[in-house]
Each structure stands twice: as C-alpha cells, then as structure tokens.
C-alpha cells in the first residue's frame, strides 16, 4: 500500500502557532494555496480518509474531493482544556507552567495534553492496522497526528506544513 499524508489547509492567522487539538476550527479559504495541492488533484486514490474535524474536511472539499471517509482516530492529540487554543507565550503565563516541563518531550506532553502519548499512538496504530493492502490511500489530518504516523511507519520528519503532502510507499 502507498499512503499520501496531507496536512489540512491553514487556519485564520489568529489560530496559527496555537495548540489546536480537538477544537473544531475552519480553514481560512483566502489562505488556501492551490499550487501546493495541484499534483494531488491529478492523482487517483483508491481510498481517501479524513479527520472528522472541519478543517480537514474543508481542505478536501477545497480540492474538489467529496468522496472520503471520516475517522475520529485521525484527530490531533487532545490538549488539556486550559491549553487548547493558546499559543506558547500564553501557556508560559499560566500559573501551572514550570520551565522544567520543557526539559523532556515526555514532560511537555504530560503537561499540555489530556491524552497520553501511549493512548495517542494506540489510536493511530489502530487506524493504520485497519487500512486495506494494495491500495493508493490519501489521508488528510493534522500536523501532530501525521508526525506520529510517520514515526510509526519509520519515516522521520520534524514538521509538516499546511497543505504539505508526503508519500510513503510500500507500507505494510
């Protein structure tokens, strides 16, 4: 199977660089760059999956794709309620913030996320395990989810930008 991983389109600037997990935000259509997805529009996919959150579905619809399956397992990691929607500077100002949380990825994740790393990974592995073999598959999801998926599949990339897409061949 071949997977093409696509990060959803950009949100309104006010939500950029914020911890936007399960908050159901819309994309900003004025920031949709058709050039970034021009090749994807021409490609034939056997199956297309999307996070159930609006920003992913709107991204596919802006690409004139309306035949896709939503799956909540493709959501971004769930942030704690007091973190959701904040940027890093705002998080630093919280009474609960401690600089020590920045010392390890595990400590930072435990501080900002309501979902453990293990639960997040299990959710994504569960989705991947159910994908049919020998298919061309497009997955539209969120930055953190796609990064975790790439790590699970042995593909390392530190960041995936809005509308960036990465193809991974020979996924077993």
Across the structure, where does each feature detected by a protein language model lie?
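Low-complexity, intrinsically disordered Gly/Pro/Thr-rich segments
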Residues: 145-157
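Short, active-site-adjacent cap segments at secondary-structure transitions
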Residues: 12, 56-57, 77, 145-147
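Phosphate-handling substructures
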Residues: 23-26, 63-123
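Generic beta-sheet signal
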Residues: 3-4, 46, 133-143
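A short, acidic, amphipathic alpha-helical segment used as a generic capping/interface helix at domain edges
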Residues: 120-133
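Domain-level recognition of soluble alpha/beta enzyme cores
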Residues: 154-172
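Active-site-proximal alpha-helix that buttresses catalytic centers in soluble enzyme cores
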Residues: 2-70
């Amino acid at each position: 199977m071949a997977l093409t991983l696509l990060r959803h389109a950009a949100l309104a600037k006010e939500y950029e660089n914020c911890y936007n997990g399960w908050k159901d935000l819309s994309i900003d259509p004025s920031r949709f760059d058709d050039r970034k997805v021009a090749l994807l529009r021409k490609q034939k996919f056997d199956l297309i999956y999307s996070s159930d959150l609006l920003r992913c579905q709107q991204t596919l619809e802006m690409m004139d794709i309306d035949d896709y399956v939503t799956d909540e397992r493709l959501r971004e990691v769930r942030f704690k309620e007091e973190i959701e929607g904040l940027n890093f500077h705002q998080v630093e100002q919280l009474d609960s913030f401690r600089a020590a949380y920045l010392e390890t990825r595990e400590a930072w994740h435990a501080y900002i996320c309501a979902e453990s790393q293990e639960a997040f990974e299990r959710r994504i592995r569960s989705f991947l395990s159910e994908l049919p073999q020998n298919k061309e598959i497009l997955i539209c999801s969120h930055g953190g989810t796609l990064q975790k998926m790439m790590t699970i599949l042995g593909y390392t990339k530190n960041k995936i930008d809005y509308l960036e897409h990465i193809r991974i061949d020979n996924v077993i």
